[in-house]
Amino acid sequence: LKKLGYFASQDLSKLVLLFEAAGKKESKSIPTLLLQGKSGAGKTFLAETFAKKIGAEEKFVQCFPRMGTENFQYDVNIEGVMKQDADKSIKDGILLQALQQSKTSPVVLIIDELDKARPEVDSFLLDFLENGRLTTGTDTYERGEFPIYTFITSNDKREIDEALLNRSKRVEVPRPDKNLFLEILGLPENHYLGYI
């Protein structure tokens, strides 16, 4: 991770290695890290760096206040709407995109700031994370042969559902301490910025 610009503690680096190994197991479940911490701690950057490290396709969704399950199932294609083309006005949602991508290559799915979305989103994600599948109406889509690694970030705006917590590994991502901050900047330990 460090070679790609992410400076992690030794414990977090080990956890990321174990997380990568979990995706290689023969299992339908999708390995999931729930990264919690204050804004600016590097949670999203960790997920993006992991995707680069393993050479995976990155799928990203930014949650927003009152975001519902429909935003994970489909997405509005503005270009199709503007052209009044009904066939192209709706496109696959982020979960279906991740499942389809996993047929050809590994995927890193980043669900950023889940705590901003409505609580029912937590329950909606359960079958996807536990069984690697998504059911929309009468159609069921399943994970391909390649792994999907899921990173969920939270700034603790609301409680995350207990069932979702049980399907993910919770990790507190602290802001860099003084020594790590200086290392990131490439400065010596005795630099004056370390005393501010």
Mark where each language-model region is:
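AAA+ P-loop NTPase catalytic core and its hallmark functional loops
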Residues: 1-194
